[in-house]
């Protein structure tokens, strides 16, 4: 057998959801640059699920469906109050809440395509409510009920702090949600597909995906970037901090990518929003530090920034808690997970790869009383 560690370069399935070709990311044939500058997140959700952009009436219907399904069962909110809040990472709370949602859905184990689509709508609608509600409850604040008159991005920000966001904040969140919505066969998406390929339910697939996204090598990088920026403190400290890490051969979070060779096409959009927001909020040091870090790392290591690098300072400028960065990733990426889950169901085959055995050769059983300690 030939082993490909990390399955790098292995084509494991075919998909019509998104593609990465020659460092260009597209959703169902639409360039990510085009979508980020022109579309709403709701349009992108529809695109990922249907492989075409919605008409005005189709978009209105989806928005209404999302608004109608955004509320959480009271029991989920009650469970949040039972968690050891000071110890629970929001990703763990999100993973648990999504699994619990299945208990309140009468269609949880109904596997026809129409029921699966309805569950997709419910999950897409409820994830931002879960994240925002937990974020407030752990601070001793009451959850903010979702509003039906706001966009998906604006409503998410509104539920987080109870204030209707301004146009710039809404634009920033909308762009971030679009940019994180799907990314071909990444670790969490592959996890979701492996799970539902067993014909497990939609909730199980999304719960498994959240578990994969929780890992720092996948979804936690922007939180690590913000931790690094906080440790650096000021632009004047960047040079010594980064060069010391490079000398020690320590990883600089937010740079390089397994798939992209010339640079992550999503990063430039977040870089622009980071610059705009940090200046508008009177916190230009976060962007200034990021620029200095980028110049050193790209110059010394030839590694361009990825989607995680500038999203950190952008989210921070929006006043979002650092440990919510990865849950926000999930709020967006669930749209892609659901698209892949529905696609897997439509043309399913159990995913069962092989492993090269590297253990001992054939051995003979020895009774326990005759075994010698090594």
Q: How would you label these PLM feature ranges?
A:
Residues 1-374:
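Non-transmembrane, aqueous-exposed alpha-helical and coiled segments at domain scale
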